Amino acid sequence: MKKLSAYILITLIPLLLFACSKPLPTELVGNESSDEQSSLEFNTISSDDELLYKNGYDSTGTDLSVPSTSVVISASSIKTTYKSKTEVKELAEAAFFDREMPVKRQGGKLLGYRTKLLGVVSFNNLQARVVPFMASFREHGAIKDTLLGSYFLLYKNNNSGDPFNFVHDSNIHFRLKGIMNRSDEFEISTPKEISAEVDVSGSLSNNDLSFKIKWDKALQGKIQILISGLSISQKNTVPFAKIYTDDKGLAKIPSSFLKDFPLANFDRIVFTLSRRKTTEYKSGSIIKDNTIVAQTIHSIQLDIPK
């Protein structure tokens, strides 16, 4: 259960990266016309400042930021591709945070908030399970785990697990049934599925390693591309940078952008593309301030040409 919880936390609240990051945007200007590629804005990620979530070989490499609202509801469809093999995970989650009960790391840095259970949660009339909410973080070079409470989950890996189906470009019905006949329910809008491929050019030894990322464009909104390094021996994924760009289907990552990342210390580089939709729900009888998002994610792992 601990390993599963660590994995799930990678996908719970990647949406908060848009809202909670402290951006210092830099533009990467390519040779493509504006019809093909927009300028890219990126934030580098400090391992000293970010929470880390390790889960082994199927990592999406997404870090978890401290939630900005007391309710976070997320539905995700995640594809993880390595060479010719693709695994598919579908999940729906709901976490209710007690913002009067912060959890801090050594030195007083905020790690997160304790969670609470407000009733019974269902997605598409499937009752979600209550599972541990675990956070992992790096402290003095070591990975430590902290239990923040419990949250609600439906999870399917390929065809194994809960019978939850994430339907793209559609809706997922959410319901929270509390005490005293109080309840909240609404539809969560889902985005068009994202599917990507990555072309590699050059190598680390020649200092000319670069990548071209192509995906099925939506022509509206933005996508996030997370770049991470994956260590097979340590079963650990470390995020390097978050890139934001218009959803036009093309992004080029030049060697000049990669030169400061410690790629030589990792076996694979991971590109995680996320397309998401936000659902507005102002206030219900139980749910007040909230973040509600559905996301389609494609995570591509590539052996690093040394």
Residue ranges and their predicted role:
Residues M1-I8:
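Bacterial N-terminal signal peptides that target proteins for export
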Residues G178-F186, N290-I297:
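Short, exposed coil/turn segments at beta-strand boundaries within extracellular/luminal domains
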Residues P23-F164:
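Solvent-exposed N-terminal domain segments of exported/luminal and surface proteins
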Residues N181-K192, K282-I286:
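Edge beta-strands of extracellular beta-sandwich domains
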Residues E187-A251:
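Short helix-loop boundary/capping segments
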Residues L250-K306:
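Hydrophilic extracytoplasmic domains
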Residues D162-N181, L263-T279:
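Short, aromatic- and glycine-rich surface loops/edge beta-strands on solvent-exposed regions
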Residues L16-A19:
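C-terminal motif of bacterial Sec signal peptides marking the signal peptidase cleavage site
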